[in-house]
Amino acid sequence: MNANLNAAAAGQLVLGADLKVNRLGFGAMRVTGRGIWGDPPDVATAVRVLQRAVRLGVTFIDTADSYGPEVSENLIARALYPYLPDIVIATKGGLVRPGPGDWNHDARPAHLRKACEASLTRLRRDRIDLYQLHAPDPKVPLEDSIGELVRLKSEGKIRHIGVSNVSVAELERCERLTPIVSVQNRFNLEDRDSDDVLAYCERKAIAFLPWAPLGSGRHASGSGSGALRALGRVADSHGITVGQAAIAWLLERSTVMLPIPGTGSVEHLEQNIAAASVRLSPQDMHALQ
């Protein structure tokens, strides 16, 4: 593996005018057990993955209290505390996990307050750099949920506010209450349903964090749909893996894009970081339209 691997090769992005991060981050959902439930199969390996990510130039780490639940946040603190000064930790609240496979909404203000304060404790932070509403709750007015995050920010517990799994209309409602510095929606080569949200983020200089940037693993083979076959051909032309080509496509797709591929493997992490140095040509991007 190239000794010069560095996430900084992807360039930088500024969150909220004051948090500069390298534009290839790390999603910490996979440092948990099967089904994003419980401890990872090998805790020591999960710790090494997190530490290696930082050594390879990752300065933005995304997690959520529901990953494990609580496991991912605890492992981040175990692996990285005391944090280097340039490390930005983002977490999320608003989904609860009563059991494996269950993802239930709870974005009531009281729950978000309790969740944020618990995340502060687990992450061993005085203030969360970026706190994201994990998803709008159909039973709670969006303004109530975001309003509580605004109060937490005014109390110094949150530095910046982001949202996840939102439409343009929902994002506009949030922005009427407070500046939104990031949006985290599902987005990858095959799933571009959030193209309109990405376009809005570009107009407003809001960071766009694509979750499932590798299509939940579907991009590993480069076979299947026409888009994936085209991705396989682009990967072959650059001598890289299909997964690396998928990350490179995201980085080239928009300057507000901040991919956060996750993994529980050091080897896979290094492959992902190598994608920061890949430059796709206009011809490549046309082939992947």
Segments predicted by a language model, with ranges:
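N-terminal binding-site loop/beta-alpha segment at the start of enzyme catalytic domains
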Residues: 1-87
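Beta/alpha (TIM)-barrel catalytic core signal, keyed to glycine-rich beta->alpha loops juxtaposed to Asp/Glu
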Residues: 7-12, 136-289
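Acidic (Asp/Glu)-rich catalytic clusters
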Residues: 16, 55, 77-88, 120-124, ...
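A short acidic, helix-capping loop that chelates divalent metal ions and anchors anionic groups
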Residues: 32-36, 96-103, 216-220, 268-271
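Alpha-helix N-cap and loop-to-helix initiation/capping positions
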Residues: 38-45, 71, 75, 103-114, ...
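Short, acidic/polar
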Residues: 39-53, 107-123, 167-173
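A short, structured active-site edge motif that brings together acidic residues
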Residues: 86-99
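Active-site groove signature of glycoside hydrolases
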Residues: 120-138
